[in-house]
């Protein structure tokens, strides 16, 4: 069935006898100046578009076109929107279709003139509408240009930002990213300081409520754990600048710290909250309501600090502006809140300057209560003798190793039979040793402590080499074995320093060999250990007398 329909379709499309199209008045696009007349399609053409044959010779007058074209003069075409000629028609817009009825064959001429008048009036109305639209477009362009010119001076009047290093964007534009309506927003660094005050007040309140002295070391550790941010004394100084009536700061000693690195005799910065006395005379407590009240006071003082900078900014404008502070609800649009300078930290109490001993005379004056009266007398005579020069040109003589003999004194019964000279020499050496201990530097004291441990470490090191059955060991292995075998608790790094000192004092017994990136220790196991121990003891006594 479908195949037959397709066959019928193609059969109908075949060219047949010539068909004459009935005359009709179709609305077409305006034809050229001299349009050709439509004629019946050729019988030989199979195309849908039919050519227009020339007019039949038997006709006396050509058939009029279906639509007439409006012809304008040269002056009218060049200026179609001139306001001085409102009656001149213009070409209609492409989107509008103007229907014109053409006179058919045998139509009276007065009907044709009436239709032409209607077409002209339509074109005039279209022209008037186009003029109105053009005037509106020109007015909008002029208003937009005026608005752009008015915005230019504001942009030129803004101060240029410095070319130096800028803060991160989340700090410079922190005020713009706050939710809600714009108001008296604090800068980012001021909000961080307010958070530090809240954390500090919380830690101080906990310590104060349980009758524990709040120190800066305790508060610093707690605030850094809460904020995950560094908290230094300069931040405490800024808090004191903003809210001076919040705490009382003092430098105190003998404060228990429960910390290994701090001694009780050291001065520490204590922080005491200033609270109002209770009505019943009880000790004031830093409760949650007081914490909230102090936090609000601190935030209000920060806002007042920013208002001062805002007031100075308003005074620098041209013309200057004056806004009452109680009526201020938001900052000036050109006031950069996040560029407000930091708060200057206030001075905190510092520990008193302790007296430092720099000369032996000061050490002796300080240590008079540590020595016996006879030794004090001998040292004073020695100081007088050394102070008086033997000759004007000769330099001062060095301190003799043995002080001069003192007048004989009654010896106790336990020292009967002992030479007085021997006793004097012993006492002189003891005084010299005490003097060396009082004037010894920390590095030398640490070296002496290591020298005292060396005899025991030498025995342990020889046992390690004997058990390992190797002529040489790496420094890491030797230190690890020594740490596990020694009775004194030391780290591998400290043990390595002892081995270096041992190789420095006894290079013929213990030698170090650096191979590439490792250091190897080689020990002479055939050497006499007693002789090695005696040499170390002698070296220790020699350095103790210095």
Swiss-Prot record:
Return the motif ranges for Cyclin-binding motif: 68-70
Q: Where is this region: Interaction with LRWD1?
A: 451-546
Taxonomic lineage from the root? Eukaryota, Metazoa, Chordata, Craniata, Vertebrata
Question: What species was this sequence derived from?
Answer: Homo sapiens
Instruction: Kindly list the positions at which Phosphoserine occurs in this protein.
Output: 31, 93, 318, 380, 394
Please tell me whether the keyword Cell membrane is annotated for this protein: no
Tell me where it mainly resides: nucleus
State the protein's name: DNA replication factor Cdt1
- What protein family is recorded? Belongs to the Cdt1 family.
| GO BP terms, alphabetized | attachment of mitotic spindle microtubules to kinetochore; cell division; DNA replication checkpoint signaling; DNA replication preinitiation complex assembly; mitotic cell cycle; negative regulation of cell cycle; negative regulation of DNA-templated DNA replication; positive regulation of chromatin binding
What remark about domains does the record contain? Answer: The PIP-box K+4 motif mediates both the interaction with PCNA and the recruitment of the DCX(DTL) complex: while the PIP-box interacts with PCNA, the presence of the K+4 submotif, recruits the DCX(DTL) complex, leading to its ubiquitination.
Q: Which cysteines are joined by disulfide bonds?
A: none
**In which domain of life is the source organism classified?**
Eukaryota
Short motif PIP-box K+4 motif, span: 1-23
Which factors induce or repress this protein, as stated in its UniProt record?
Induced by E2F transcription factors.
